[in-house]
Curated annotation (Swiss-Prot):
Protein encoded by which gene: pgi
Gene Ontology CC entries for this record: cytosol
Pathways involved: Carbohydrate biosynthesis; gluconeogenesis; Carbohydrate degradation; glycolysis; D-glyceraldehyde 3-phosphate and glycerone phosphate from D-glucose: step 2/4
Name of this chain's protein: Glucose-6-phosphate isomerase
Residue positions of the active site: 261, 282, 392
Length: 401
């Protein structure tokens, strides 16, 4: 599924195995396990929910429209774009930008669509307004042959769904939005999009077994968490995901939310950034290598690309070279890794065997566990988002003025 390499995080010489062992990670580990065992937080329990039959009626629509914000949509996008980067019957309305939303609504035939309205609170402004845009269009149709599905626990949207007898799925209360991709929030729309959700859960469960390991060197979530924690303490508080698989771009967006919203509290926090290799070697690499030394890089690579071929070309000295096309991007990644390490920039590497459902389930779950461990290391509540809630309240006030 995936492997994790951390040798370059030690090679640059700023932290050692001894430093790692000095961190009280055993306490972080047992605190998180206690929270998961006692149901204080439920993101582990949901990967063991085997009842996927409940999604069976959600198949067979030409288009899948998903409306939601933040944790209610980013995980779905991360998995969908990784698994099916070249399909285009998916429409994600994840903002209130009129040009984006209205151009999607112009294009999509609602009669041929299953439309998901996803909001745990049921009161998020953007989601509510985007639903009303859809509602207005549906009301104008003579008869609506598509399907509306609500994934919500309450608020205005749940009342709307109940009033109109729409399908409703709920989200376990102890699973916060950004940890909810393995609930109906992610699984229902992914199922409609043809993604094998049982394999996603299988990948997450395999990773869960690995993350139960108390030996930090055998537990990538714990180890990556401690490495990022130690570098943060040394002033390297910007965590860059540099993916050499472009279809992981939306995984990067999900990562930014998970890290930013979970750990950015009480003056703590790591700033997550996303870069795409090899493109960003021609832009941001200058900053990463030669600029302020405040970053730790996570390379994301694939052992096997789903499309590949033999190529032949001539180099600048007219010498013939033949190789696989994927050897080019692999060499670029390796070269960047060596150069960064030589310049004292710590980096780790996650290698996915192939981009598929199992690997994506494992990857997202690994990060959920990592952030859970990191919340314990910083002694903060990784599962709330008071600052986000504060803005939501102010915005409701402004809109009503
Ligand atoms: O992680 C979170 O809790 C947030 O990002 C929410 O997912 C986001 O604000 C949307 O909230 P809701 O699902 O209530 O519409």
């Amino acid at each position: 599924m995936l492997s994790y390499d951390y040798e370059n995080a030690l090679k640059v010489g700023e932290i050692s195995l001894e430093d790692i062992n000095k961190v009280d990670f055993a306490n972080a580990y047992s605190n998180l396990m206690e929270k998961l065992d006692n149901g204080v937080v439920g993101f582990r329990d949901v990967i063991y929910d085997e009842n996927l039959d409940k999604y069976k009626s959600l198949n067979g629509y030409e288009n899948v429209v998903v409306i939601g914000m933040g944790g209610s949509i980013l995980g779905t996008m991360a998995i969908y774009y990784a698994i099916s980067p070249f399909n285009n019957n998916a429409y994600f309305i994840d903002n209130s930008d009129p040009e984006k939303t209205l151009s999607i609504l112009k294009k999509v035939d609602l009669n041929e669509s299953i439309i998901y309205i996803i909001s745990k609170s049921g009161n998020t402004l953007e989601t509510l307004v985007n639903y009303y845009l859809i509602k207005k269009r549906i009301e104008k149709l003579n008869s609506f042959k598509g399907k509306l599905v609500f994934i919500t626990n309450g608020g205005k949207l749940k009342r709307e769904a109940e009033k109109n007898n729409y399908d409703i799925f709920s989200i376990p209360e102890n699973v916060p939005g950004r940890f909810s991709v393995f609930t109906a929030v992610g699984l229902a729309p992914l199922y409609s999009l043809g993604v094998d959700i049982s394999k996603i859960l299988e990948g997450a469960r395999e990773m869960d077994k690995i993350c139960q390991n108390e030996d930090i060197l055998k537990n990538p979530a714990l180890l990556n968490g401690v490495i990022h924690y130690l570098y943060d303490k040394r002033g390297k508080d910007i965590s860059v995901i540099m993916s050499y698989v472009e279809s992981l771009k939306y995984f990067g967006d999900w990562y930014k939310q998970l890290i930013g919203e979970s750990l950015g509290k009480n003056k703590h926090g790591i700033t997550p950034l996303l870069s795409i290799g090899a493109k960003d070697q021609h832009s941001l690499l200058q900053l990463y290598m030669d600029g302020k030394k405040d970053k730790i890089i996570t390379f994301m690579v694939a052992k096997k690309y789903r499309l590949d071929e033999e190529i032949e070309f001539e180099d600048i000295n007219d010498e013939k070279i033949s190789c696989r096309y994927s050897d080019i991007i692999r060499s670029q990644q390796k070269a960047t890794e060596i150069a960064l390490t030589n310049n004292g920039v710590p980096n780790v590497r996650i290698t996915l065997d192939e981009i598929n459902e199992m690997a994506m389930g494992a990857l997202l779950y690994m990060y959920e566990m990592q952030v859970g461990f990191m919340g314990e290391l910083y002694n903060i509540n990784a599962y709330n988002q008071p600052a986000v809630e504060e803005e939501k309240k102010i915005c409701w006030r402004l809109i009503k003025q």
